[in-house]
Amino acid sequence: MATPHINAEMGDFADVVLMPGDPLRAKHIAETSLEDVREVNNVRGMLGFTGTYKGRKISVMGHGMGIPSCSIYTKELITDFGVKKIIRVGSCGAVRMDVKLSDVVIGMGACTDSKVNRIRFKDHDFAAIADFDMVRNAVDAAKALGVDARVGNLFSADLFYSPDGEMFDVMEKYGVLGVEMEAAGIYGVAAEFGAKALTICTVSDHIRTHEQTTAAERQTTFNDMIKIALESVLLGDQE
């Protein structure tokens, strides 16, 4: 049954959904990576599609920017449409000097300055982590594709334009690989409602050096990330 934010019916979505922030990226993924594609959501322009990858039913849908937006969509996908696994595919900014532009980062866990998981977890700290099997499958898929993926913590920020530059020093000290805006929220939603989740990011810019990838570089590494996500789903089916 349709929700206030998703005009689909039970069965329209696959049990696994890839989720970029940008709905137009969702459309691009559907058009370039899936077969037999059909649109399953267009409410508020948050496009969602279902198709097949090597015969396996997979969906892709945008989640918007920030934890509040992605939390709404992931919650409804899980509780109203039977989705079991969510893979966020997005971009992040690097803070460590050994993390380079275009690196693929697999988010094993996610720190955050958001309070949403504390609200969920009765004002206690919740360890926002990805599902282990999904992490392992993504790592194995990356190796098979010849992509040297990094595995570690992300930082999910509430502010894109943060005034606290000193926090980047703390992130670097604690080994945070990349800064983005959604992973911790998605991991919290998945835990609360009994689903599994993973975040895979490509490094689009470096916060320290102010370097940025070109449009062509972003597209190449974005395609690598999507391939890793899709192949990891197939590996998960073999478990």
From Swiss-Prot:
Gene Ontology biological-process annotations: purine nucleoside catabolic process
Superkingdom of origin organism: Bacteria
Residues reported to bind a purine D-ribonucleoside: H5, E180, M181, E182, S204, D205
InterPro entries reported in the protein's UniProt record: DeoD-type, Nucleoside_phosphorylase_CS, Nucleoside_phosphorylase_d, Nucleoside_phosphorylase_sf
One Pfam family recorded for the sequence: PNP_UDP_1
Keywords tagged on the record: Glycosyltransferase, Transferase
SUPFAM superfamilies xrefs: Purine and uridine phosphorylases
Class of enzymatic activity (EC top level): transferase
Active site as annotated: D205 (proton donor)
Site feature Important for catalytic activity, where: R218
GO MF annotation terms: purine-nucleoside phosphorylase activity
GO cellular component, one term: cytosol
Alphabetized PROSITE patterns for the sequence: PNP_UDP_1
Reactions mediated catalytically: a purine D-ribonucleoside + phosphate = a purine nucleobase + alpha-D-ribose 1-phosphate; a purine 2'-deoxy-D-ribonucleoside + phosphate = a purine nucleobase + 2-deoxy-alpha-D-ribose 1-phosphate
This enzyme's EC code(s): 2.4.2.1
Function: Catalyzes the reversible phosphorolytic breakdown of the N-glycosidic bond in the beta-(deoxy)ribonucleoside molecules, with the formation of the corresponding free purine bases and pentose-1-phosphate.
Family: Belongs to the PNP/UDP phosphorylase family.
Assembly and interaction partners: Homohexamer; trimer of homodimers.
Record's protein name: Purine nucleoside phosphorylase DeoD-type
Source organism of the structure: Salmonella gallinarum (strain 287/91 / NCTC 13346)
Gene name per UniProt: deoD
